[in-house]
Every structure is written in structure tokens, then in C-alpha cells.
């Protein structure tokens, strides 16, 4: 790995934030087109653009950090601030969903039967699949911490093992969540309960998929000897993101599954 000890910002401007924003616009517009006009063309274009952006952005980060040595201290500091601000924006994103849920559940209107859950809604049992999902995510939080400590101690094999376990637990969580959606006795169209439940848990599920992808890239990089005990911010950012996903799920479980049922 090339290392430069001077304090200069070496990374050149990147086009990928712009293409990433455009792909997000295409995906959200495509989702609306799919819902209202049953056309998936724009959505597929958005997904393709997003995947190409992800691939090329990660490729450039690997080249700049590992092969060119451009991740000097100011660059690493900028990346840390960027990740912190990104996670902060995600906190506010989920705050909106919790606000919608509590606004509706703390003072249910007469149209909902003046109680929560609304009349006609059979909520999911919080002690069944949701509790298993909670256990799976908490276990993944332990394994990602194990991976981080192994990397700090230059224990390559244990780091790979722990990271693989985390990814598999993330995949298992996603499959459990999908099976829960298929078996749920209500849909996203069933009033405010259905919409807040599926939007909040669905967006969390999307974040689990994104986090699993992030960790998979880290696993590939670790297999290629890209990380050292002193230079591994890519993995650190993924670990921060994964812990954020864990914490959000705990709030979702307590609020929507346990208290809300």
C-alpha cells in the first residue's frame, strides 16, 4: 500500500456524487411511475444507473486509497466528517417515520376506532419473528465488533470469518423480514397503521441491504489485502453504518412491534 505522510488533499473531484443523485431521482420517479402507471422502465434505468455509480465510485476509492496513496490525513478527516453527516441525515430521515407513527398512535382519531391498533388490524406478535430478527441483528453487531478488533490486532483470518458471519446474519435478517411481509395479515394500503409499519420497516430493510452490500465490498477488499490495522476507514465507515442500522431496529421493535401492538 502506498502511503503519503504530507497533509495535502490529493483526491481529485469525482462525478459519482452527481450521477448517484441523478440515479436516486430516477429511482424515486420510477417508483411513482410503477405505482401509478405500471411502468418499470424508469425504475430499471434508475437501478442500473445506481449500480454503475456504486461500482465505479467504490473502484475509484480503492484506487485512490490503496494504489495511489491519496488518502492523506485531511482526506481521511473529510471522509469521517462526511460519514458522520450522512448518518446524521439518516437519523432525521427515520425521525420522520417515528413522528408519523407516534402522531397517529398516541391520539387515535374516531375514524381509527379511537384506539390503537386501529379497528380491523391484527398486529404481528412481537415475540415471534420480530424477536428473532432482533436477536439476529444484535448478534451481527457483536460479530462486526469482533471483526473490527481482529483487524486492529492484524488477525486477518478472524477478521474475514467475523465479517462473513455479519454478512450472512444480514442476509438472514432480510429473508426473515421478507417472509414476515408475505405472511402479514395487513398491507401497506390498510390505513395509517399499514402505511407507517411497511414504510418504516421497509426503509430499515433497505438500509440492511445497503449495509450488507457495503460489508461485502469490505470483505472483498480484505481478501485482496487492502486493509491494515492503521488504514481501514472503509471498513470503519461500514461498521458505523451497521451499528446505526442496529440501533434503528431496536427503536422500531420497541415502538412499532412491541408498544404499537
From Swiss-Prot:
Its EC number is 7.1.1.9. It catalyses: 4 Fe(II)-[cytochrome c] + O2 + 8 H(+)(in) = 4 Fe(III)-[cytochrome c] + 2 H2O + 4 H(+)(out). The chain crosses the membrane at residues 16-34, 41-66, 73-105, 129-152, 156-183, 191-223, 233-256. Residues 35-40, 106-128, 184-190, 257-261 are mitochondrial intermembrane. Residues 1-15, 67-72, 153-155, 224-232 are mitochondrial matrix. SUPFAM superfamilies: Cytochrome c oxidase subunit III-like (SSF81452). It is found in: Mitochondrion inner membrane. One of its GO terms (biological process) is mitochondrial electron transport, cytochrome c to oxygen. GO terms for molecular function: cytochrome-c oxidase activity. Pfam families: COX3. Component of the cytochrome c oxidase (complex IV, CIV), a multisubunit enzyme composed of 14 subunits. The complex is composed of a catalytic core of 3 subunits MT-CO1, MT-CO2 and MT-CO3, encoded in the mitochondrial DNA, and 11 supernumerary subunits COX4I, COX5A, COX5B, COX6A, COX6B, COX6C, COX7A, COX7B, COX7C, COX8 and NDUFA4, which are encoded in the nuclear genome. Belongs to the cytochrome c oxidase subunit 3 family. This is Cytochrome c oxidase subunit 3. It comes from Gorilla gorilla gorilla. The gene is MT-CO3.
Amino acid at each position: 500500500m502506498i502511503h503519503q505522510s504530507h497533509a495535502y488533499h490529493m483526491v481529485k473531484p469525482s462525478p459519482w456524487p452527481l450521477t448517484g443523485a441523478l440515479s436516486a431521482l430516477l429511482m424515486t420517479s420510477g417508483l411513482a411511475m410503477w405505482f401509478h402507471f405500471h411502468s418499470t422502465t424508469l425504475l430499471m434505468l434508475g437501478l442500473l444507473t445506481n449500480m454503475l455509480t456504486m461500482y465505479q465510485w467504490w473502484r475509484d476509492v480503492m484506487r485512490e486509497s490503496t494504489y495511489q496513496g491519496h488518502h492523506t490525513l485531511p482526506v481521511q478527516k473529510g471522509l469521517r466528517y462526511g460519514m458522520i453527516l450522512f448518518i446524521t441525515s439518516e437519523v432525521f430521515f427515520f425521525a420522520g417515520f417515528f413522528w408519523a407513527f407516534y402522531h397517529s398512535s398516541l391520539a387515535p382519531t374516531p375514524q381509527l376506532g379511537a384506539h390503537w391498533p386501529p379497528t380491523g388490524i391484527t398486529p404481528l406478535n412481537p415475540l415471534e419473528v420480530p424477536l428473532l430478527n432482533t436477536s439476529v441483528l444484535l448478534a451481527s453487531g457483536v460479530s462486526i465488533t469482533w471483526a473490527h478488533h481482529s483487524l486492529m490486532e492484524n488477525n486477518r483470518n478472524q477478521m474475514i470469518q467475523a465479517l462473513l458471519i455479519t454478512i450472512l446474519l444480514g442476509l438472514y435478517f432480510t429473508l426473515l423480514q421478507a417472509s414476515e411481509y408475505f405472511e402479514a395479515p395487513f398491507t401497506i394500503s390498510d390505513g395509517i397503521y399499514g402505511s407507517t409499519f411497511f414504510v418504516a420497516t421497509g426503509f430499515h430493510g433497505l438500509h440492511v441491504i445497503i449495509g450488507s452490500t457495503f460489508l461485502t465490498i469490505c470483505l472483498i477488499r480484505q481478501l485482496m489485502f487492502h486493509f491494515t490495522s492503521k488504514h481501514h476507514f472503509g471498513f470503519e465507515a461500514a461498521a458505523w453504518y451497521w451499528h446505526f442500522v442496529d440501533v434503528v431496529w431496536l427503536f422500531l421493535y420497541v415502538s412499532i412491534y412491541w408498544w404499537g401492538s
